[in-house]
Amino acid sequence: MAVPRNRHSNARKNIRRSHHAKQARHAAVCNNCKQAFIPHTVCTSCGFYNGKAVMTVEKK
């Protein structure tokens, strides 16, 4: 099994991990109701997906 011969500094460790942060979720705009929603999912405000009514949403 591989064992490191020399200690890695904190700076070197942090530089290596600089790309490990969570990325922000992108938002798309619904063509039916113009509300923001997560891409490739059903719009939670109107229930449309890809221009078709997939589910019914109760209006408050």
Curated annotation (Swiss-Prot):
InterPro entries with a match to the protein in the record: Ribosomal_bL32 (IPR002677), Ribosomal_bL32_bact (IPR044957), Ribosomal_zn-bd (IPR011332)
Protein name: Large ribosomal subunit protein bL32
Segments for region (Disordered): 1-23
A family per Pfam: Ribosomal_L32p
Organism: Chlamydia abortus (strain DSM 27085 / S26/3) (Chlamydophila abortus)
PANTHER family: 50S RIBOSOMAL PROTEIN L32, LARGE RIBOSOMAL SUBUNIT PROTEIN BL32
Molecular function terms, GO-annotated: structural constituent of ribosome
Key words, A-Z: Ribonucleoprotein, Ribosomal protein
Homology family: Belongs to the bacterial ribosomal protein bL32 family.
One GO location term (cellular component): large ribosomal subunit
GO biological process: translation
